[in-house]
Design a protein with these regions (language model features):
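Cytosolic regulatory modules rich in charged/polar residues
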Residues: 1-256, 366-394
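Hydrophobic alpha-helical transmembrane segments of membrane transport and translocation systems
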Residues: 305-307, 311-397
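Glycine-centered flexibility sites
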Residues: 27, 63, 67, 86, ...
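Transmembrane alpha-helix detector for multi-pass membrane proteins
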Residues: 218-234, 249-324, 329-330, 335-341
């Protein structure tokens, strides 16, 4: 009956009632015909979707300006368009009991680490949650378990750029696509993977290397610039030996540590407010935020100009790296260092640095080698490839 009368590509027969009900919930159409003991399941679903457009984050000056959207089929097509090889595998999975989310593992058969792939499959199969309404984040947390909640460092990289996801697949990584999400999840993820981004590969190798080195310097400055400056200006004698430019010229009544913490919270408040501000009021909000954080705060003797200058640098530097999660991890560590320095001076800074190193060493990725790979365990070739943008050759992407 199906072969003779139903002229549709996506159709199959089903006898199991439970499977039929599940398919209907997933959007398929069930055709029941009297006299036949099978049901024809026709995949004619079409969900509302926005068009393919450039993502708001991770923009590039050159290169493709398309991005993933909330439709899984379209995202898979964007990858297939770039990798026209039979080795590209798109492996489908179902996750959660209620939402029955579609998850696709994208990898190259001839490049993927089989042990790594089996580990990802096992973790997906063990996900025991009723719903994954937050898409990738829910899946990532379920795969991590509850043992790593205390570490702020991100264990997953996200990208909304098909070209970046394609490059990761070509290098042997696994890209996880989730329906209803415009971001791809890249596994495995290590700390030094955040050093590189798409712009590095759209410029010559020398410029790409410079951008990576600049990003590493920004990582360090974002975490240490305000704690080290606070440590130096706590004692006026420390800023007399050639460091006079770091000293505070104006008088202040609010303790310096309180000023730094207050500035950190004000910056976060402005970020949160900007997310919920309608576009019509965005210009007014920018002017109000600049006045409150700048002129009024100084005139009211809440903050000294030096605190504003360093916090402005930190706020700008946070946007120089591609991961929001990593930016907030640096922020929490920076607050910890400020409190340690305020309480224990030089000893506090040393203890804070030791604590950060121990935290990095104790952090475990979802799958793969250690979080500090390729530094620990040391892989000189992989470390060099991360720090230096090599020219394109036959063996790399």
């Amino acid at each position: 009956f199906i072969d003779r009368y139903i002229t549709f590509n996506e159709v199959n027969a089903e006898q199991n009632v439970k499977n039929t009900v599940t398919s209907v919930f997933l959007g398929k159409m069930a055709l029941l015909v009297e006299g036949y003991d099978e049901c024809a399941l026709i995949d004619a679903k079409q969900y509302p979707a926005r068009g393919v457009e450039e993502p708001s984050s991770g923009k590039v000056l050159r290169g493709a300006h398309d991005g993933f959207i909330e439709t899984l089929v379209a995202n898979a097509a964007l990858l297939r368009r770039r990798i026209r090889a039979p080795q590209l595998t798109l492996e489908g999975h179902k996750v959660s009991d209620c939402s029955r989310a579609d998850v696709v593992l994208c990898y190259l058969e001839n490049k993927v680490d089989r042990k790594l792939l089996d580990e990802v499959r096992q973790k997906l199969a063990k996900i025991d949650v009723r719903s994954v309404s937050m898409s990738q984040e829910s899946i990532a947390e379920a795969m991590m378990g509850k043992k790593q909640w205390w570490t702020p460092f991100p264990k997953v990289r996200y990208t909304e750029r098909p070209d970046a996801a394609t490059a990761c697949v070509m290098e042997g990584d696994i890209v996880v696509l989730v329906d209803n999400s415009p971001a791809a999840m890249i596994l495995p993820t290590h700390f030094f993977d955040f050093v590189q981004e798409a712009n590095d590969f759209y410029f010559p190798p020398l410029i790409g290397t410079y951008l990576r080195i600049l990003r590493i310097v920004v990582f360090l400055l974002t975490m240490f610039i305000t704690p080290v400056w606070f440590l130096l200006v706590k004692d006026p004698a420390r800023t007399q030996a050639g460091l006079e430019f770091l000293a505070i010229d104006s008088d202040y009544s609010v303790p310096l540590l309180v000023q730094l913490l207050l500035a950190e919270f004000i910056v976060d408040l402005l970020k949160l407010a900007s997310l919920n501000t309608p576009d019509v009021f965005s210009n007014s909000f920018s002017m109000l935020g600049a006045l409150v954080l700048g002129d009024f705060a100084v005139q009211a003797h809440w903050l000294v100009p030096e605190v504003l200058a360093y916090m402005a640098f930190v706020a700008i530097a946070n946007f120089a790296q591609p991961s929001y999660e990593l930016g907030y991890a640096f922020k929490l560590l920076r607050l910890m260092l400020l409190l340690f320095v305020g309480a224990l001076d030089w000893v506090g800074l040393a203890l804070g640095c030791i604590g950060i190193i121990a935290l990095l060493a104790a952090t475990k990725p979802i799958v793969g080698k250690g979080y500090l790979y390729p530094l620990c365990p040391l892989d000189k070739k992989a470390l060099f490839a991360l720090l230096v943008r090599k020219p394109i050759s036959r063996d790399n992407t």
